């Protein structure tokens, strides 16, 4: 599940895996059922969970009614019994447009705020935590946002099972759970295997954008920036921070973050340094 400390993002999207195309097997732990994890056999590291209890949030009556009225159109859920169920993005959005996937959208505050700034893009928010998705469903319904869709499921499994290779213009991972304890580092979403999987889903020229305010996690990511040969690491060029075009032209879609996420704002108030990472698919 991909998450951020002591917040709804603790229940995000980092349920994760080992690696590759061996048959998927359902894994259960404790008294609760946890998401299926694909077993990959390519020697790379993939985020995974051993035992983890998902927070069970409840919806208000209004949220439940809004969910029932809008989820069939706006949302999908990972079917853990199906190995591959690739989404027809054109049909789902009712148009052909570049698609950006946000892994671990949390409560969707920044997702809903950014979408009107990029109406020419299809945005797919992936989140495991239903109350977080319910808040985003409410915002999309209330504000009439047309370019957001949602998937309830683990981020790695959703990428593996629901998106065709080379079908995405971008992937975003903003403020993932740093899993600070050493014994939990295997749960971090940024791993060699995840980078490989993301690269396989990006089309040539597609962008991977990661942001963190956790210093030790940034060091972890620093060690992996060149780990995936299909991705060219370009850092965070100064001209992009100022809103200029660096000549690549296609970068603006993912770097025009004019609004702070809840966790970014928290980090700034704590005087944490926010580090941004950008890669392009070769």
Swiss-Prot record:
Residues engaged in binding S-adenosyl-L-methionine: 102, 127, 154, 177
Gene: trmB
UniProt keyword annotations, A-Z: Methyltransferase, S-adenosyl-L-methionine, Transferase, tRNA processing
EC number in record: 2.1.1.33
UniProt protein name: tRNA (guanine-N(7)-)-methyltransferase
Stored HAMAP family: tRNA_methyltr_TrmB
GO cellular component: tRNA methyltransferase complex
Active site: 177
């Amino acid at each position: 599940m991909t998450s951020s400390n002591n917040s709804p993002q603790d229940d995000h999207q980092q349920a994760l895996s080992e690696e590759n195309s061996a048959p998927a097997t359902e894994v259960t732990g404790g008294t609760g059922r946890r998401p299926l994890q694909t077993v990959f056999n390519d020697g790379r590291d993939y985020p995974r969970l051993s035992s983890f209890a998902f927070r069970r949030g409840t919806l208000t009556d209004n949220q439940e009614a809004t969910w029932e009225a809008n989820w069939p159109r706006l949302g999908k859920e990972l079917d853990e019994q199906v190995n591959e169920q690739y989404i027809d993005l054109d049909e789902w959005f009712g148009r052909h447009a570049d698609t950006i996937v946000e892994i671990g959208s949390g409560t969707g505050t920044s997702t809903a705020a950014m979408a009107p700034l990029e109406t020419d893009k299809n945005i797919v928010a992936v989140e495991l935590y239903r109350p977080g998705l319910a808040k985003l469903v409410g915002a999309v319904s209330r504000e009439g946002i047309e370019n957001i869709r949602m998937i309830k499921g683990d981020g790695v499994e959703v990428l593996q099972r629901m998106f065709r290779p080379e079908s995405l213009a971008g992937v975003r991972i903003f403020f993932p759970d740093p899993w600070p304890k050493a014994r939990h580092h295997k749960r971090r979403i940024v791993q060699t295997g995840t980078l490989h999987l993301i690269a396989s889903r990006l089309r040539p020229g597609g962008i991977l954008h990661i942001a963190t305010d956790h210093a030790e996690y940034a060091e972890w990511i620093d060690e992996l920036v060149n780990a995936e040969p299909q991705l060219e690491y370009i850092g965070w060029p100064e001209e992009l921070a100022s809103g200029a075009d660096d000549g690549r032209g296609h970068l603006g879609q993912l770097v025009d973050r004019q609004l702070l996420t809840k966790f970014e704002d928290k980090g700034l108030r704590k005087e944490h340094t926010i580090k941004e990472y950008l890669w392009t698919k070769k």
